[in-house]
UniProtKB/Swiss-Prot annotation:
Function: Sulfur carrier protein which probably makes part of a sulfur-relay system.
Name under which the protein is recorded: Sulfur carrier protein TusA
GO terms, molecular function: sulfur carrier activity
Xref: SUPFAM superfamilies: SirA-like (SSF64307)
GO biological process, any: tRNA wobble position uridine thiolation
GO CC annotations, alphabetized: cytoplasm
Active site: residue positions: C17 (cysteine persulfide intermediate)
Keywords for the protein's UniProt record, in alphabetical order: Cytoplasm
HAMAP family: Thiourid_synth_A (MF_00413)
Source organism superkingdom: Bacteria
Recorded family membership: Belongs to the sulfur carrier protein TusA family.
PROSITE patterns associated with the record: UPF0033
Subcellular localization(s) per the UniProt record: Cytoplasm
Length: 79
């Protein structure tokens, strides 16, 4: 995938469920549609929770790196 232009980065390293998703929800609210939030996490639950959050809240998971921590997720606000 080509370079993704990140609007904001959210570091949730050391936080455990449900804190990472709660912070994602809080931070993505401040972005405009089409802007991108990069989430960095080490909680294994985020590999399930972030994609589910995107689907439920109608955001787009552009890319993820979940082979080993730290995990990274590029989420675009909106579809």
């Amino acid at each position: 995938m080509s370079e993704i232009s990140v609007t904001q980065t959210l570091d949730t390293l050391g936080l455990r469920c449900p804190e990472p998703v709660m912070l994602v929800r809080k931070n993505i609210r401040h972005l405009n549609d089409g802007e991108i939030l990069l989430i960095i996490a080490d909680d294994p639950a985020t590999t399930r929770d972030i994609p589910s959050f995107c689907q439920f809240m109608d955001h787009t998971l552009l890319q993820s790196e979940v082979e080993k921590p730290p995990f990274k997720y590029w989420v675009k606000r909106g579809k």
